[in-house]
């Protein structure tokens, strides 16, 4: 079955009672004030159709969803052996901002989608781009077709003001020789990436290339090769939802990437991308109602990579 607007609306009605059972991220003060009752979904098909329901056009901070975009840029710039000697490809099984595993493994992060891995990727982008945050913003605007996407400066500044743990991660990696630049300028770019302000429609369209073998609908030149597209989707399927990746694979069965702003992007290779948003999180830091919405959609339309 193909998704329809009615299916999306019915699913949001079913998951709405979950609102109040999760917790909005409060360790970043600018995120703590987001209303907890927001709920939206957008589906973008490979033939260019966009379906929406709920608060799909309201912007929010995409947070760690941006890590998949930063990885995409890094894969364009670096040879595989350069990239993967600095960051791994395995699930961590730890909290996304954990230092314990990082020290045990000599400063090499488990994967690009935990904080340590994304900070290494930011360090690599900083080495190649004169203005990394502007390059990322240009990239997102190109993919989404929306020139009005911006960084939320309030969120970025809030993260910078509460950056001690991420700075500790960066300095620990630097002590092991896995960090090339000054820490704070790299972190500033990292926080700006997390502070991208987008909505479900923007996100669903932006990630279209991952559902289409690296080709973005409406853009002639490939964004990544088919092999790179497969690799990014594989990492999203195994590592994209922190230490809840296995639960997400079991319930939803799609490559995905979440953020503590309450957004999740999910990929149905060869067919569509799906973006959901609900700010309240489960204990793993993933959207509680958003995950349930994706689970129901997977069941209703009969889509899964498994």
Swiss-Prot record:
Keywords per UniProt: Hydrolase
EC number(s) reported in the record: 3.5.1.2
Residues that hold substrate according to the record: 64, 115, 159, 166, 190, 242, 260
Protein name, per record: Glutaminase
Any one GO BP annotation for this protein: glutamine catabolic process
GO MF annotation: an example: glutaminase activity
Family, similarity comment: Belongs to the glutaminase family.
UniProt organism field: Aliivibrio fischeri (strain ATCC 700601 / ES114)
Assembly and interaction partners: Homotetramer.
Gene name as annotated: glsA
Pfam families, A to Z: Glutaminase
Catalysed reaction, written as an equation: L-glutamine + H2O = L-glutamate + NH4(+)
